[in-house]
Amino acid sequence: MASKNREIIKLKSTESSEMYWTVKNKRKTSGRLELKKYDRKLRKHVIFKEAK
């Protein structure tokens, strides 16, 4: 289970409706997260942005 310093967030693809769920540390990462991950629908790597 996540501690109180970590927050469960979802990452939404910029090119499709694909989503990932992950955990981020609120103290160390104050801004919004952007990661390049594999999109299964498009079958290629795209940028995923943090969504609330």
Swiss-Prot record:
Keywords: Ribonucleoprotein, Ribosomal protein
GO BP term, pick one: translation
InterPro entries: Ribosomal_bL33, Ribosomal_bL33_CS, Ribosomal_bL33_sf, Ribosomal_zn-bd
Keyword Ribosomal protein: yes
GO molecular function, one term: structural constituent of ribosome
GO cellular component term, pick one: cytosolic large ribosomal subunit
Protein family membership: Belongs to the bacterial ribosomal protein bL33 family.
NCBIfam families cross-referenced by the UniProt entry: PRK00595.1, rpmG_bact
Protein name as it appears in the record: Large ribosomal subunit protein bL33
Organism this protein belongs to: Chlamydia trachomatis serovar D (strain ATCC VR-885 / DSM 19411 / UW-3/Cx)
